[in-house]
Each structure stands twice: as structure tokens, then as C-alpha cells.
Amino acid sequence: DAHDNETLYDLGVLKLPKDTTMADRVRMNTLSLATVTLSQTPSFWHAGTELLRSKSLDRNSYNSGDWFNRIDWTGQESTFGSGLPPAADNQAKWAVMQPLLADPALKPGPADMAAAEASALDLLRVRGEVPLLRLGSADRIEQKVSFPNSGAGATPGVITMLVDDTVGADVDPDLAGALVVFNASPEATTQAVPALSGRSFTLTSAQANGSDAVVKTTTWDAATGTV
């Protein structure tokens, strides 16, 4: 998300199934931020997105004033449900917005915002810890980055990315590669990359010591190249 259009959390309110749990909404927020943070490019996060920032579904808050643009940096109060956003760019969707904004199940609590922030900060630590996730050159990216298991046979909702430092000039003196799996599906996934059999992969220390218990269940089978 950015300053234009809905915030990332508000997009989830509009696009995810209405019965999606708040815990899964937090995970989707983290996953969405991960696709930016771990994808080589300079990362751009909208202010407050790590706290599930809401503008009450306002898609253009430039002239909406402090009421719709405010952020509680203490993480104690979500601004979701502050009222119907101004008519200028939103009135056509008021009928859709009104019941959503009135639903207390869609308003994050302090614990939800804290979980989202902790997971988001873990992502920044991962990016800082692994130089291979910020190669800094289009030529290096083209040379070292690939997407195993992509194409027609890809698992729906899952993207596997390999940054292979055994190809070309060495970038990271400590790591020979970085393997990233983005799983937007509702189920746990297994990805086999036979070409990586015999190589060793472990969670970064930021993940192994981080806030996400699900991420910590990740395993690597070197014999088969399966994560």
C-alpha cells in the first residue's frame, strides 16, 4: 500500500472472505509486506502498515483530515470503524462499506496490532541479516534469482524464490544461497527443489528467534531438497 488508495489492512477487509479470522488477517498483512521486503527492491511501507493501519476504507484520504488519517503509534486503538469515509471518492461503495465498518470482529485489538508489528519487524531483521535479499544490481538479480516450481505446475498461492550465490561473483561470504517461500494458501505447503538436494538451509536467526511460531515449524530435508 501507499498514500493513495486503501491501506493494506483495509484492502484485506474488502477482499478477504468476511469470516477470515483476525489471526489470519494479521498473517496476510505480514505476508503482503514480506513480498516487498524480501524481493530485492528498495522497500516502501506506508506509515503504520505494520500496525494494521486503517483509514476506515477511505480510498483517497488526501483531503479527509486528521480523523481518517490519524495513527495511534502506541498500538492501543485501531482507527477502523471511525465512520463512513468522505463521499468524494467513496460514496459509490458506502453500501458495501457500512456493514463492514460496523462489524466489531473486523476491528483489530491491541494484541493483534502488537502481533502484526512484531512480525513486520522480524521481516526487516531478515532483510538486514541476509545480503542476498538486497543484491543492489539488476544484473546480479537476473543472474542469481530464480523461481523454482513456477509455471503451470506451481502450487496455487505459493511462490518459491531462490537467490543462488554459487552463481556468478560471490556476494555473501557467509551464505551460498537464500531460499524464500511465500505461502498465501490456507494450508501448510511442501516445496521440493531437487536441484538443491545436498545443500543446507536453516531459518535466519531473526526467524528462529522471532515472534512467529508458525515460521519456526519450517523444516529442510537436504536429502530430497524439500522445504
Where are these regions (language model features)?
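Loop/helix patches that line or flank the sugar-binding groove of alpha-linked glycan CAZymes
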Residues: 1-179, 184-190, 198-199
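C-terminal beta-sandwich/jelly-roll accessory domains of carbohydrate-active enzymes
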Residues: 186-227
